[in-house]
Design a protein with these regions (language model features):
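Helix-biased "structured C-terminal domain" signature
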Residues: 1-354
């Protein structure tokens, strides 16, 4: 399914009826998503009179059509002049497929909520505390105090912000079986509850397996779903997938272990360090629905309840393949985990220096 997602999301993956024009031109007659409404880094200074390619999407809150910059909907999109692409990155966040369109929509919404939670967790436990420390150091230096520099590769994250989740008593057999495989292999598995203020269960799963005294496999996975059991299973299966890819060496974007003595990620990265707080899996809020439409409604209600008023779906289905593929775009959700470069209003709530 993932290969179908990727192919269908390419500019050449299906017939594309681009609507070309500037924001100023199109917004006079249509609803248009402005590039600055979303949390994405721009590659250059954007102006509203710049020509771009757009694709039609649907706002799930209103049912109305909204024009979306093609660069946000498609993967590896490069415009032809005179159109421009102001965005600095391309990625697959919010891209999902399903047996039916409703399933694809549910998966896509869960993914953007998951990436938002991941971004906020990374910022709160690592990036923002490091910035605070650097700010304090620079202030002391400016006052003439002799302060030694601290580098990012020696900074220790805060592992106590997000609780570890005890899954020893879980009764959901698929997740229980997966966790037992780690236990039987002697590989530690750490589960953290990183659910954001959106309120949809989200977990971070991690493992470190030392092969020798200075070589090991480090893996991380995430999962989000209204049903906390499914969210947990997704996180564990993703960390398993990452481990397999790491062992195989088939990707070039996997996280590397710093092999310096006493400076490995299991001693300084929040995802891999035990938390001071532990909760039972049964304490995590969960939602059970028999109809996937009810799951979608729940996701939308939670987004709206957290101040996110627009949720756009762009249909990217290739008619020859016939497998529903969509891209979800929710203005306001964070993407720092992907881009490592920008923060939106949700992240900035935690970024205050008195």
């Amino acid at each position: 399914m993932e290969s179908i997602e990727r192919y269908s999301s390419l500019p050449s993956g299906a017939p594309r009826n681009f609507i070309q024009g500037s924001y100023d031109q199109l917004s006079s007659t249509s609803r248009v998503l402005h590039p600055e409404e979303i949390v994405e880094p721009l590659g250059f200074h954007y102006r509203n009179d710049m020509i771009m390619d757009f694709l039609p999407g649907v706002d799930l809150f209103t049912g109305q059509q909204i024009m979306v910059p093609a660069a946000l909907a498609l993967f590896r999109y490069s415009p032809k002049a005179p159109a421009v692409n102001p965005f600095a990155f391309h990625h697959t966040n919010g891209l999902a497929s399903g047996n039916v369109e409703e399933e694809a929509i549910c998966h896509s919404l869960c993914e953007v909520i998951e990436r938002d939670a991941m971004s906020l967790a990374e910022l709160r436990a690592s990036a923002i505390p490091f910035h605070f420390l650097k700010h304090i150091m620079n202030s002391l230096k400016a006052k003439g105090y002799p302060i030694s520099a601290i580098s990012a590769d020696t900074f220790k994250d805060d592992p106590g912000i997000f609780p570890d989740v005890d899954i020893s008593e879980i009764e959901f057999e698929p997740a229980k079986d997966m966790a037992n495989k780690f236990s039987n292999a002697g590989i530690p598995l750490i589960i953290k509850d990183i659910t954001s203020t959106v309120g949809i269960p989200t977990f971070n799963a991690s493992s470190i397996e030392w092969v020798t005294h200075d070589y090991g496999y480090l893996a991380e996975g995430h999962g989000t779903h209204p049903d906390s059991r499914i969210a947990l299973l997704r996180a564990i299966t993703e960390v398993s997938q990452t481990r397999a890819a790491n062992i195989q060496g088939a990707r070039d974007d996997l996280r590397k272990i710093n092999y310096g003595q006493d400076n490995t990620d299991d001693k300084r990265a929040w995802q891999f360090m035990p938390s001071k707080n532990t909760i039972k899996f049964s304490e995590v809020r969960t939602y059970f629905n028999e109809d996937i439409l009810e799951d979608i409604k729940l996701l939308l209600d939670h987004l709206k309840g957290d101040g996110l008023a627009t949720a756009i779906i762009v249909n990217l289905t290739n008619p020859e393949i016939g497998i529903p593929v969509v891209r979800a775009v929710v203005p306001g959700l964070e993407t720092f985990k992907i881009t490592k470069s920008v923060m939106g209003h949700r992240a900035k709530r935690y970024f205050k220096i008195e």
